[in-house]
Amino acid sequence: MNSNDLAKRGESLIRHSTNRYLTTVRIAFRAKQRRFDDFDGLLEESTVKPVQRAIIELSDEQDQPDLLPG
């Protein structure tokens, strides 16, 4: 994942949101969850930082809502 692609995904999340603040909070909350998952050993070692992983996950959820459970 290069920085340009990550920036585009982040911009897309903000652009498609109705509330930029809540989107930023969602990214931060997801990153915090991923960070604790890393500490708990639930995720394999990765070079992708938690904030980057959160942006990727939320962007994928936005672009492909059929991936969401339920």
From Swiss-Prot:
In cyanobacteria the RNAP catalytic core is composed of 2 alpha, 1 beta, 1 beta', 1 gamma and 1 omega subunit. When a sigma factor is associated with the core the holoenzyme is formed, which can initiate transcription. This is DNA-directed RNA polymerase subunit omega. Its EC number is 2.7.7.6. InterPro entries: DNA-dir_RNA_pol_omega (IPR003716), Pol_omega/Rpo6/RPB6 (IPR006110). One of its GO terms (biological process) is DNA-templated transcription. Belongs to the RNA polymerase subunit omega family. It is an enzyme of class 2 (transferase). Promotes RNA polymerase assembly. Latches the N- and C-terminal regions of the beta' subunit thereby facilitating its interaction with the beta and alpha subunits. It comes from the Bacteria. One of its GO terms (molecular function) is DNA binding. One of its GO terms (cellular component) is DNA-directed RNA polymerase complex. Keywords: DNA-directed RNA polymerase, Nucleotidyltransferase, Transcription, Transferase. It catalyses: RNA(n) + a ribonucleoside 5'-triphosphate = RNA(n+1) + diphosphate.
